[in-house]
Amino acid sequence: MLAAEVAGLGNYGMRGTRHSVGMEVLDRLARQLAVAEGWRVDKRCCADVALATAHGLELVLLKPRRFMNLNGLSVASAAEIYSLGPGDIYLVHDDLDKALGKVAIKLGGSARGHNGVQSCISALQSNEMTRLRIGIGRPEGDVTVPNYVLSPFSAGEREKLDQILAQAVTCLLEHIQSRAPAEPGDRG
C-alpha cells in the first residue's frame, strides 16, 4: 500500500493560535478518518502520531511536539521511520498571504518566509513537499507579524474556523485521492 505523511505544522502547546492552525486541521482530519482516539506520542520523532487510511493510501498523521522553527526535525524523522520521501509528505500550515478562509494546495517551492516550512526544507534537504496552505490574513494596524501569528483567533474568526477546517480537510483528501492508485476496473 502506498503511504503519505501529513504533518500539521505549529507550535506545540500553543493550540488555538493562528500559527498552529495546521495542527487543528490534523485534529479535524483524524476525526473524519475515525482515528481521533489513535494519537500516540512517538518519542522517535518527537511528535503525536496517528495512522489512518484514505483512498487506498496509508497515512501517517503527525503533529510535532516542537516549536514551529524545529518542526522539520519531527517531519524528517517520521519520514525516515516510515520510509517516505519528500514527495510523499504534505505540510499543512498557516499562510499570511492568503485571506482568512482561503485554502490552497501548493506543489513544492520555497518556504515564502514560513519558518516551519523552512525547517522542513532544511531537515529533508528538499522542497518537494506538497503544502496545504490555510489563509490567516495579515495583521491590521501596528500589530507585528509575530504577535499576530502567535495570538488566538478572534471570536469572529473562530466562528468561521469550523467551516475553514472542513474545507481544508476536503481539499487535502481530494488531493490525496488524486494520488491514490486506481481501483481495479477503473479506466482513468
What do the PLM-derived regions correspond to, one by one?
Residues M1-G108, Q118, S122-L132, P139-T144, ...:
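Nucleotide and nucleotide-moiety/phosphate-recognizing core
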Residues A104-S110, Y148-F153:
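Short glycine-enriched, charge-decorated loop/helix-capping segments at active-site entrances
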